[in-house]
Amino acid sequence: MKVILASKSPRRVEILEKIVKEFEVVQSNFDENTIDFKGDIEKYVKDLSRNKAIEVSKRLNEPSIVISADTVVFQDGKVLEKPKNEEDAFSMLSSLSGNTHKVYSGICLINTYDDTVVTDCDCTEVRFSELNPRQIRNYINSGEPMDKAGAYGIQGLGGAFVEGIKGCYYNVMGLPLNKLYKALENYDITIL
């Protein structure tokens, strides 16, 4: 059975390559703005990942396992997705500075052969160092934060701001590896 990653994220590709030998990437065209956050962060990221997987699965012509994910940073009851512009990134990084936040990733696996759908969610706590405005501006000028939830990438320059984490490192990158590995064990595909 084919494995399809419903994401254009190079970080998700890199993570999935750790456990799945062969897969294809098919970008989801689902409009994430059609789902509003209504207070339940786990439901929100699972709904987003499920809708991404459904959109891709409808375009496939052969039995496949479609994997999708959605990752957000959550702090003080607010969802921090990808920054809209540099000012938005500055605001996000300023609010994360010196504080602990949570990163939630929803994952979804759809078996297109029998239409089974599995969703799950992972949460990682991340503690940031105190950052001054110059550090934040320098980081924004690198361009790195502009395509990442919460305006930072733990696997890149943004990792310098992280004092510690509690939970899955790969979840912060965008794909909770252990949860995904456990979910994939139920399918007839080669993993590891």
Curated annotation (Swiss-Prot):
Subcellular location, principal = cytoplasm
Q: GO biological process: what's one of them?
A: nucleotide metabolic process
A Gene Ontology molecular function term for this protein is:
dTTP diphosphatase activity
The positions making up the signal sequence are none
Q: Do you know which InterPro entries this protein is assigned to?
A: ITPase-like_fam (IPR029001), Maf-like (IPR003697)
Q: Which reaction does it catalyse?
A: dTTP + H2O = dTMP + diphosphate + H(+); UTP + H2O = UMP + diphosphate + H(+)
Specify the superkingdom. Answer: Bacteria
Per the record, its GO cellular-component terms are:
cytoplasm
Question: Pfam families this protein is in?
Answer: Maf (PF02545)
Q: Where in the cell is it found?
A: Cytoplasm
| Entry EC number(s) | 3.6.1.9
Q: Which cofactor does it need?
A: a divalent metal cation
- Which SUPFAM superfamilies did the record assign? ITPase-like
Keywords, comma-separated and alphabetical = Cytoplasm, Hydrolase, Nucleotide metabolism
Spell out the family assignment given in the record's similarity comment: Belongs to the Maf family. YhdE subfamily.
Q: What is this protein called?
A: dTTP/UTP pyrophosphatase
Organism of derivation: Clostridium perfringens (strain 13 / Type A)
Q: What taxonomic classification does the UniProt entry list for its organism?
A: Bacteria, Bacillati, Bacillota, Clostridia, Eubacteriales
